[in-house]
């Protein structure tokens, strides 16, 4: 069971249950039995697991556990594939990929989380998906992310791809943006109900 992973992804990361259910059903995330870490699986074009990264479900003093499973192939990343789609959207972290998919309700495009700012997983993904012609970079809006986006954009434009860079509207990354948007929506909802209660009391 994924009780702690669900609690972490829904409450801390503000992802919808619908999206988390989708990734669980696709066997792209699971929970370790011993420490209850959430595990993100990267599969190849045949569906074979090639990569797995772990994230602690409890933030101890602001320093959550992060790590890769032993014998990982880092040229694979956490991904969503659609052979009929000609674009891949690239993120640094798995949770950012999930956050974007949740916020935009985007279940159609190819999506890939590099696990860092290194583009080795993108090279592999493009090799396995020759139909892709467009790359959209959704890396973090920080110094490292902006630098990586510029370098990756230049490299793949020279290889003949159409490349765009798209940072979140605000915040450092797509999960930070999603969390802020969801909390803002809750506050607006509570304020509307509070105003309605006042009007009814006055009436």
Which sequence ranges carry the predicted segments?
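Phosphate-handling DNA/RNA-contact segment within nucleic-acid enzymes
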Residues: 33-128
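TOPRIM fold recognition
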Residues: 102-203
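Short, solvent-exposed polar/charged micro-motifs at secondary-structure junctions
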Residues: 28-33, 62, 173-178
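Electropositive nucleic-acid engagement tracts
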Residues: 5-35
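Generic structural signal for bulky hydrophobic/aromatic residues embedded
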Residues: 12-14, 43, 103, 177
């Amino acid at each position: 069971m994924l009780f702690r992973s669900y609690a972490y992804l829904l409450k801390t990361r503000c992802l919808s249950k619908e999206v988390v259910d989708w990734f669980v059903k696709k066997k792209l995330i699971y929970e370790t039995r011993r420490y209850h870490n959430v595990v993100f699986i990267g599969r190849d074009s045949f569906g074979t697991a090639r990569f797995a990264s772990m994230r602690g479900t409890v933030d101890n003093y602001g320093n959550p556990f992060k790590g890769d499973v032993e014998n990982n192939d880092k040229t694979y990343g956490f991904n969503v594939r659609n052979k009929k789609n000609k674009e891949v959207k690239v993120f640094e972290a798995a949770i950012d990929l999930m956050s974007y998919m949740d916020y935009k309700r985007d279940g159609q495009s190819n999506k890939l989380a590099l696990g860092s700012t290194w583009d080795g997983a993108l090279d592999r993904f493009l090799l396995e998906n020759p139909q892709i012609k467009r790359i959209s970079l959704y890396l973090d809006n920080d110094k490292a992310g902006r630098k990586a986006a510029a370098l990756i954009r230049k490299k793949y434009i020279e290889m003949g791809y159409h490349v765009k860079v798209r940072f979140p509207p605000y915040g450092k990354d797509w999960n930070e943006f999603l969390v802020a948007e969801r909390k803002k929506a809750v506050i607006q909802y509570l304020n509307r109900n509070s105003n309605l209660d006042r009007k009814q009391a006055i009436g």
